[in-house]
Amino acid sequence: MAEHQVNYASGLPVVLTSVDKLVQWGRSNSLWALSYGLACCAIEMMAAGGSRYDFDRFGTIFRASPRHSEVMIIAGTLCKKHAEFTRRLYDQMPDPKWVISMGSCANTGGMFNTYSTVQGVDRIIPVDIYVPGCAPRPESFQFALMILQKKIRKEKASRKIAPKRLI
């Protein structure tokens, strides 16, 4: 049998771990994603949202507003002029929030080693999951969502605090 943490402060036993598991199950199975397609990887992200891969079974719904999203998916090359706008979108998302960096260009700048390209999205905002490839297949993106779901289930139910600005 699994042991549960019991709190007798109110005089009655209260099981706290079950509430944590319930909240994390709900969060992990209803991922509302802000699709932020910047280049070729966005085409694979759109293909992943189609009926062939059926992302609805994971509870993933693509949203257009950052205020209705908890997962930001950055797919493609991020230019330095666009970096502050990306940070503003991230700041508008409610806590807890997670970021998936999709593709070589989003992860490391890809083949564009120029003055105008951000060499990795993690220089602007914190990234939770990296999806490698140029352009990564929808199956890789699907696997990244499953890893994110496992990560969310392991976190505490308390609200995740966003780190300070990186720029």
Curated annotation (Swiss-Prot):
Record's subcellular location: Cell inner membrane
UniProt entry keywords in alphabetical sequence: 4Fe-4S, Cell inner membrane, Cell membrane, Iron, Iron-sulfur, Membrane, Metal-binding, NAD, Quinone, Translocase, Transport, Ubiquinone
GO molecular function list: 4 iron, 4 sulfur cluster binding; iron ion binding; NADH dehydrogenase (ubiquinone) activity; NADH:ubiquinone reductase (non-electrogenic) activity; quinone binding
GO biological process: aerobic respiration; electron transport coupled proton transport
EC number(s) on file: 7.1.1.-
Cofactor: how bound: Binds 1 [4Fe-4S] cluster.
GO cellular component: plasma membrane; respiratory chain complex I
InterPro entries from the UniProt entry: NADH_UbQ_OxRdtase-like_20kDa (IPR006137), NADH_UQ_OxRdtase_20Kd_su (IPR006138)
Cofactor field: [4Fe-4S] cluster
Broad class of the protein's primary localization: membrane
Name of the top EC class for this enzyme: translocase
Reaction(s) catalysed by this chain's protein: a quinone + NADH + 5 H(+)(in) = a quinol + NAD(+) + 4 H(+)(out)
Amino-acid positions noted as binding [4Fe-4S] cluster in the UniProt annotation, renumbered to this chain: 40-41, 105, 134
Keyword Cell inner membrane: yes
Membrane topology summary: Peripheral membrane protein
Pfam families given in the database record: Oxidored_q6
SUPFAM superfamilies: HydA/Nqo6-like (SSF56770)
Record's subunit section: NDH-1 is composed of 14 different subunits. Subunits NuoB, C, D, E, F, and G constitute the peripheral sector of the complex.
Family: Belongs to the complex I 20 kDa subunit family.
Function: NDH-1 shuttles electrons from NADH, via FMN and iron-sulfur (Fe-S) centers, to quinones in the respiratory chain. The immediate electron acceptor for the enzyme in this species is believed to be ubiquinone. Couples the redox reaction to proton translocation (for every two electrons transferred, four hydrogen ions are translocated across the cytoplasmic membrane), and thus conserves the redox energy in a proton gradient.
Entry protein name: NADH-quinone oxidoreductase subunit B
Lineage: Bacteria, Pseudomonadati, Campylobacterota, Epsilonproteobacteria, Campylobacterales
